[in-house]
Regions:
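Positively charged, polar, low-complexity stretches
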Residues: 1-109
Length: 109
């Protein structure tokens, strides 16, 4: 099974925009800190039903993070794609360290 979240690449013009889009799409809490550490913390709990995002994954289920218009993001804000890659890597590392399957997959469209 796979759940999916779509980030609109036309809106991803820099890091503040990334945090706005992530807050909206992932359903992050009001106290979300608008930084990558906070994003990693929130998305690390996607299997815990901890209220840190709107997603609750079953064991072994993936959350596909789909970035639309990724070529545009690569041109206008490459740091956003690098940040998303780092977030996915760190969240999946946390899951691996806990003996769980990866939780996130980044898809550039």
């Amino acid at each position: 099974m796979t759940a999916s979240a779509r980030l609109d690449g036309r809106q991803l013009t820099g890091m503040p925009a990334l945090h706005r889009e992530c807050r909206r799409e992932f359903g992050l809490p009001d106290f979300y800190g608008n930084n990558l550490s906070a994003l990693i913390d929130c998305l690390s709990g996607v299997r815990d039903d901890d209220g840190m995002s709107r997603f609750v994954l079953a064991p072994g289920e993936l959350l596909d993070i789909i970035v639309t218009d990724a070529d545009l993001v690569r041109l206008q804000a490459p740091e956003v794609l690098a940040a998303l890659e780092d977030v996915v890597e760190e969240v999946n590392l946390r899951h691996a360290e806990a003996g769980a399957a990866p939780a996130l997959r980044l898809l550039l469209r």
